Every structure is written in C-alpha cells, then in structure tokens.
Amino acid sequence: CTPIEEDEFSRKFSRRLRAAKSELGKIDPAALFESTKSKTIVYYANPKSSCLVEEDEEPPHALDIDAKNIALLISSALKSTIFSEIHVMRKTVIDGSNTTGFQRTMLVAQGGHIQVDGKEVGVQSICLEEDAGKLIKDEGNHRFFSLDRLGVPLVEIALDPVEGDPKFVKDIALTLGRLLRVTKKVMRGIGSIRQDVN
C-alpha cells in the first residue's frame, strides 16, 4: 500500500504478540524475552497510508518491483555479487513494531566495496527489507505505534568493520549517502537515510 506520513488516524486496534516456534521448532530467545513483558500493542492507522496488509488482515502483496530494481542498481554500483534468486525471509520481531510479528527481508547481494579517501571499504551484504511501524509512546503495559511507514521498502547495506578516526567514518557515510542519491531513486531529506554505527 502507498505509504504517506500522516498525523491523523481514523482507525485504532490492539494486539498481543506472543513468541511462537519457528519452522525449525525453536523459539527465538529475543522474542521470548519480549513476550515476557506482556505488552498490549495499540496501532493507529489511516486508510490513506495503510491498508489491510499493514493491519495483518490480508496476505502480503507482491514484491515492489521498483524497490527490487533499486536494490539491484545499488548492488551493481557497489560492485557486489548479486544472487541469481532472491527469497523472502522472515525475521521474528514481536516488540510491536510490526503487526505480523515478523519483518520480511531479502538478501540481494554480498561482497563489493566503495573507495573512500583512497582506501577500499568492503561491503558485507545488501538486503531489501521493510520498514517498521513508528513508535509513538511506550507507557505501562501498552506500546503505541503508527502504521504510516510500515512496509516501506528499505535497502540495508552492511559494511565490513572499519578502523579509523571519526572523520574517516564520517567520510564513509557521506560517500555512501552520495552514491545512493546519485541513483535519483531514493528518498531525500532529514531522516530518510539512517546509518547505524556499531
């Protein structure tokens, strides 16, 4: 469904998410820990920005072809090895940020690199995944999310560990950001590109 960031919500519903066994017959420890909090999740939705998929009331729609093509374009620009088949995987997430209890992720490519200040920075993996719901507040036994960005396609680029001073790390982030903007296929603006440093 077409995501539009909205501040007005005409629909509200609640859920309790529980840890369940995976296809391998095991329960994810992080999911089990989260389920011990016994939170009731309250979701706010606007029909302009979310549909029954985001409410987990109908099956997921087909993969967004434009998002897949953008992930392939970025993978090529980073000289990554693109897989001949892309499969949808499910990551268990029961903190309430996803109504289904899992996030859909696709491993698109591995390897590759970018040049920064004359040094080669390796790429570990490139994934296409979906964004989570936006946390509004967490109080007592309730957690509140808006669904206006749930399911928005994201390209996740994991780089090799980097050694260097903070300026070099900043230069890597700037170089990667510029590469993404050159595609003219990614959202621009504050908060549209998120970069985590671990």
Where are these regions (language model features)?
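Basic, nucleic-acid-interacting segments
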Residues: 1-198
